[in-house]
Amino acid sequence: MWFLVFSIWIASGQLLPHISNVIEKELDQLEITELSREYINNKFPITQSSCVKNALGEFLEICMRKGFEFVDADLRVITAVRLSVCEFESSGLTNYPSECHEKRLGGIDTISCVNALESSPQWWTTYSGNYQNLPHICMENSLPFEKEQILELFLNITDMYSEFQRNIENYWKSFSSDLEINGKENIDMIQNLFNSLVNDLIQNHKMKDEELITEFDKMKAEFDIRFFNFTESFDNLNDEVNEDLSLIKSHLIETFRQVDSEYMAQLQKNKNSTDKAFNELESMSTYILDHQKTSMELIDSFFSDLIDLTRDKNLVISDELMQTQEETIHLIFQYNKLVHESVIPLLTDDLLPVVRGVSNSIVENLDNMNVELTSHLENVSQTIEVKFKALEKETDRSLLKAKEVESNLRNLNNLVSTSLKGLQTIVRLLTFLLKRQVVLVGILQIFLRKYISMNLYLYAIAVVVTALAGSKVGSWGSLLMKSFVTR
């Protein structure tokens, strides 16, 4: 750090003369104000003085800032007169009234000039037109006036910047002269400080090296002694941990075997019940099909017998009617009108009741057969529906049991995988701790600044490991019990 500061001071001391020469050369150039005014006059000819500009100067200032209504009547008259004079001079007319000359307008009353202009129609027309056009002139010349105001503001800023530049140049001259005077003294002082600092650093470095070598020799001797003690303790602890892990492993294997056998028995039992339910379902479906087939055969037989019986009765009735008709026709032809009148009522009274009785009996038989067939079909459909519902419930129950068995087996597999992973993690943790416990003892002694015996450290590690193993085994045992209770 001191070396960096020293280098900066040396570089600044070398650059000071060059900077001073550059500043002196720049001071000989033209000032910014003169250059700015020359540039503006070349690029903006509006800033150059003219007759119309001088005539409208005071009028436009009030008109643009406040409005045409705030312009005084006398100022309007003076402005119109000045514009008329500018128009006369620009057209080459020199014999306009002497009362209206520019040099006399500021010190005399404008009434005499207006009266003089009134004497000639041409003069009065020019004055009247300019007076009436003053509002339009205010609006038309607003942009040049604003430009002029902006340029004036720019020139004011340029003047201020030029003054600021001159102040900076004067300050820089005084600062550079003071810097050149004090530079050598500061460099000598920094050189002395740097030399003393380097000497102090060299002495401190030598002392620290000697202290570190002595401390390292002590730590090496203590490390050899503790490492020898640690190897003996580590062998004993390793044997104890291996025995504990062997016991835990054998216990877990036995537990897994018992759980596996119980789950296999439960699975076989559920499988048998499922097979039995499927067999019952199959036999029930076979019975229903046979019963349905028998019912359909009975219905076909019943309708066939009914049709045959109806056909026979219709044939008998038809034959009887034909015979009766033949006999009647024969009697009609034999006995003529008298016989006809006596026989027809007799036949009518005898045959109509017989025909009506036979028809009524046929209709009643058909209605009874329809009612009996409908009730029988309803009973058969209800029986089939009840048996199908029972069969569906048995099937759902069997599927639920199979899903429960599958879920229990999946949980058991996850539990076994988690247990094995936990054992592997504990073994890796023990190996890691046992390999690095010497370094941990050294770090603890450095932080606590106190000697810790190897026996005390190994006892603490044994307690922590036993607690971790016990908590893991306890959690696995509780998970196994919960799974058995749930099952």
Curated annotation (Swiss-Prot):
<keyword id="KW-0539">Nucleus</keyword>
<keyword id="KW-0472">Membrane</keyword>
<keyword id="KW-0256">Endoplasmic reticulum</keyword>
<dbReference type="GO" id="GO:0048288">
    <property type="term" value="P:nuclear membrane fusion involved in karyogamy"/>
</dbReference>
<feature type="topological domain" description="Lumenal">
    <location>
        <begin position="16"/>
        <end position="450"/>
    </location>
</feature>
<protein>
    <recommendedName>
        <fullName>Nuclear fusion protein KAR5</fullName>
    </recommendedName>
</protein>
<feature type="glycosylation site" description="N-linked (GlcNAc...) asparagine">
    <location>
        <position position="272"/>
    </location>
</feature>
<dbReference type="GO" id="GO:0005789">
    <property type="term" value="C:endoplasmic reticulum membrane"/>
</dbReference>
<keyword id="KW-0325">Glycoprotein</keyword>
<comment type="similarity">
    <text>Belongs to the KAR5 family.</text>
</comment>
<keyword id="KW-0732">Signal</keyword>
<keyword id="KW-1133">Transmembrane helix</keyword>
<dbReference type="GO" id="GO:0000742">
    <property type="term" value="P:karyogamy involved in conjugation with cellular fusion"/>
</dbReference>
<keyword id="KW-0415">Karyogamy</keyword>
<dbReference type="InterPro" id="IPR007292">
    <property type="entry name" value="Nuclear_fusion_Kar5"/>
</dbReference>
<feature type="transmembrane region" description="Helical">
    <location>
        <begin position="451"/>
        <end position="471"/>
    </location>
</feature>
<feature type="signal peptide">
    <location>
        <begin position="1"/>
        <end position="15"/>
    </location>
</feature>
<feature type="glycosylation site" description="N-linked (GlcNAc...) asparagine">
    <location>
        <position position="156"/>
    </location>
</feature>
<feature type="glycosylation site" description="N-linked (GlcNAc...) asparagine">
    <location>
        <position position="379"/>
    </location>
</feature>
<keyword id="KW-0812">Transmembrane</keyword>
<feature type="topological domain" description="Cytoplasmic">
    <location>
        <begin position="472"/>
        <end position="487"/>
    </location>
</feature>
<dbReference type="Pfam" id="PF04163">
    <property type="entry name" value="Tht1"/>
</dbReference>
<dbReference type="GO" id="GO:0031965">
    <property type="term" value="C:nuclear membrane"/>
</dbReference>
<feature type="glycosylation site" description="N-linked (GlcNAc...) asparagine">
    <location>
        <position position="229"/>
    </location>
</feature>
<comment type="function">
    <text>Required for nuclear membrane fusion during karyogamy.</text>
</comment>
